[in-house]
Amino acid sequence: MDPMESSSEQDIVEESQKLVDSLDKLRVSAASSSSNFKKKPIIIIVVGMAGSGKTSFLHRLVCHTFDSKSHGYVVNLDPAVMSLPFGANIDIRDTVKYKEVMKQYNLGPNGGILTSLNLFATKFDEVVSVIEKRADQLDYVLVDTPGQIEIFTWSASGAIITEAFASTFPTVVTYVVDTPRSSSPITFMSNMLYACSILYKTRLPLVLAFNKTDVADHKFALEWMEDFEVFQAAIQSDNSYTATLANSLSLSLYEFYRNIRSVGVSAISGAGMDGFFKAIEASAEEYMETYKADLDMRKADKERLEEERKKHEMEKLRKDMESSQGGTVVLNTGLKDRDATEKMMLEEDDEDFQVEDEEDSDDAIDEDDEDDETKHYYL
């Protein structure tokens, strides 16, 4: 094996172990932060497909918070971005060098982004601590994520970061939709399915931001969400399998549409920003009423399961002690078994040696007898 490949594999294993340790650390801190939960600032995690205008939309949010005299705090989690149109208070690029990660681990672009995010997640408890110290002075924390949406939404590091935020502050996920491209019913349904998967994976309030309304009005999307018959009429002319599937899904997603907030925005003109922040405030209240209670219940369940596991282990140890009648409980008998085996092998060797000695002595006696017989014959 190439030494460089072996070193790279070892680095990846160490990175994975750090990620697991970080997750355990964040879970412990989350369990102890229930009483220290802060109602402000509101964390806004912005996600979206590549090309949906996510970074431009975040830039507009930064400008709006400045114009409205609100206090915002910006966190950039995209290690591959060359330049940002806004200043980031916390930038992953200051901690992790994306191109160096690609060289060191022999990775491609997507693997480099994922590994950079993993490395940053191992220290994310420090990021939360920094925001906690400034919590009383902030209204919003705006979080920009990598352009490859699946790297954040479906990775362990993305789950760590989301859970760390949600366990300490009111957290809302914003899914940015490319409105002109979603004018196709099939593309619209694909976007809605992805938004639905994010909602159920994060278990956090979700706000749909239909971006680029300066190019295409988003009213058609709202109509499709409010009345499935309008959507079915739009897709009626298409007889393909995907159209039939989308037609069926429009009924299944009706309940999903009722439980999310949707707004039309324009990152270029700034239209819809007031409505967006109203939706964020309403989602933060929903978080405190519904999602926070669910989060506390899940924490309690984890703690209960952990206590049950500890009790089970203690009970098992107690039974082992009783069965040994106060003697030492041998947890690993490998050495004992090995010593017994070695002793048995030595005894077998001694027996073989004795047998060989007896055979040699018998041979010697036989030779003496033959000599005597020979002498007697010649005499």
From Swiss-Prot:
Biased composition (Basic and acidic residues): 303-322, 335-346
Domain of life: Eukaryota
Tissue: Expressed in individual cells of roots, leaves and flowers.
A Pfam match: ATP_bind_1
Region described as Disordered: spans on this chain: 303-379
EC primary class: hydrolase
Annotated positions binding GTP: G51, S52, G53, K54, T55, S56, N211, K212, T213, D214, A267
Coiled coil: 288-322
Compositionally biased spans, kind Acidic residues: 347-372
Record-listed E.C. numbers: 3.6.5.-
Recorded family membership: Belongs to the GPN-loop GTPase family.
Identification of the protein by name: GPN-loop GTPase QQT2
Lineage summary: Eukaryota, Viridiplantae, Streptophyta, Embryophyta, Tracheophyta
